């Protein structure tokens, strides 16, 4: 194993033990840093002390030529900067060679959401099969509270307060949020809890796979996509779309940007403000369809 690999493994242990990052986040860091290890090795580097800003820029250019998108490249460079900052803190480097290297600005894509009618159709799962009940409960909780996928699969039974209709979730940066989930979600969680022991009860996880283990994020993605097809939705149903839909529908109904920010667990209001653009798109489409002066040729 080279010094390049050794330092990255030390850094990943630091992120896991000291920073307590989630397994999904750790895997993402590992993938990004493996890419720079491969590039550095191809260019004859034996240690990170040999890395300079020119090499980082060449790495960025190579990544773009290989088809890496602007947003993905920004993520890769961010991981690299964080890694080099850590090496500086460990006195392994004198300065961060990636500090002045930035990716081209990524175009900001508006998140896609599911409209209210389609959401009602998606949630209209009335089958007494235990797995269908579990899936309906997961859909209700995700849409009812606007959870991230990692927050949904991380829920334990102890995080529930069904009497008050709330859940506790651990979000990004180990920040805990207490969220209302709505009476429909409560009802379907209770229905699922009546059936949950059929899959085993040793695991603390709220939502179990058919093997009795905590359900995986990949399994949730697969099940949601299948339900989207079964329920006749035209668009692919991804878990994050339910979070986008929650935010959009809440903002359309309340207009309370700060409140939606708190519910979503966004550290910065600017992250939540993207949903105001979605709301404007909705209003603009209504205007174009209904206002006499907006109709072309009239």
Curated annotation (Swiss-Prot):
Localization (cell) = Cytoplasm
Free-text activity regulation comment from the record: FtsK may regulate the catalytic switch between XerC and XerD in the heterotetrameric complex during the two steps of the recombination process.
Q: Name one GO biological process term.
A: cell division
Query: What keywords were assigned to this record?
Result: Cell cycle, Cell division, Chromosome partition, Cytoplasm, DNA integration, DNA recombination, DNA-binding
* DNA-binding in keyword set: yes
Q: Which residues form a coiled coil?
A: none
Q: What is this protein called?
A: Tyrosine recombinase XerC
Q: Which organism is it from?
A: Shigella flexneri serotype 5b (strain 8401)
**Biological classification of the source:** Bacteria, Pseudomonadati, Pseudomonadota, Gammaproteobacteria, Enterobacterales
Q: Which gene encodes it?
A: xerC
């Amino acid at each position: 194993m080279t010094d390049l690999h050794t330092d990255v493994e030390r850094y990943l242990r630091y992120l896991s033990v000291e920073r307590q990052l989630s397994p999904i986040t750790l895997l993402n860091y590992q993938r990004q840093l493996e890419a720079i290890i491969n590039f550095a090795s191809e260019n004859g580097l034996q240690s990170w002390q040999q890395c300079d800003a020119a090499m980082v820029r060449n790495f960025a250019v190579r990544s773009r030529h290989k088809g890496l998108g602007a947003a993905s490249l920004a993520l890769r460079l961010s991981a690299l900067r964080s890694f080099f900052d850590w090496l500086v803190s460990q006195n392994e480097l004198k300065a961060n060679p990636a500090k002045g290297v930035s990716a081209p600005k990524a175009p900001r894509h508006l998140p896609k959401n599911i409209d209210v009618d389609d959401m009602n159709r998606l949630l209209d799962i009335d089958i007494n099969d235990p797995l269908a009940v579990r899936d309906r409960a997961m859909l209700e909780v995700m849409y009812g509270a606007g959870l991230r996928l990692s927050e949904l699969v991380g829920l334990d039974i102890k995080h529930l307060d069904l009497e008050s209709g709330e859940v506790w979730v651990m979000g990004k940066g180990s920040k805990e949020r207490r969220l209302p989930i709505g009476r429909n979600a409560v009802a379907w969680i209770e229905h699922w809890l009546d059936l949950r022991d059929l899959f085993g009860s040793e695991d603390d996880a709220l939502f179990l796979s058919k093997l009795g283990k905590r359900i995986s994020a990949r399994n949730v993605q697969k099940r949601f996509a299948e339900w989207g097809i079964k329920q006749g939705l035209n668009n692919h149903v991804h878990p994050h779309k339910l979070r986008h839909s929650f935010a959009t529908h809440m903002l359309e109904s309340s207009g309370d940007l700060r409140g939606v920010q708190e519910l979503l667990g966004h550290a910065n209001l600017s992250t939540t403000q993207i949903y105001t653009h979605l709301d404007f798109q909705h209003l603009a489409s209504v205007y174009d369809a209904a206002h006499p002066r907006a109709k072309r040729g009239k």
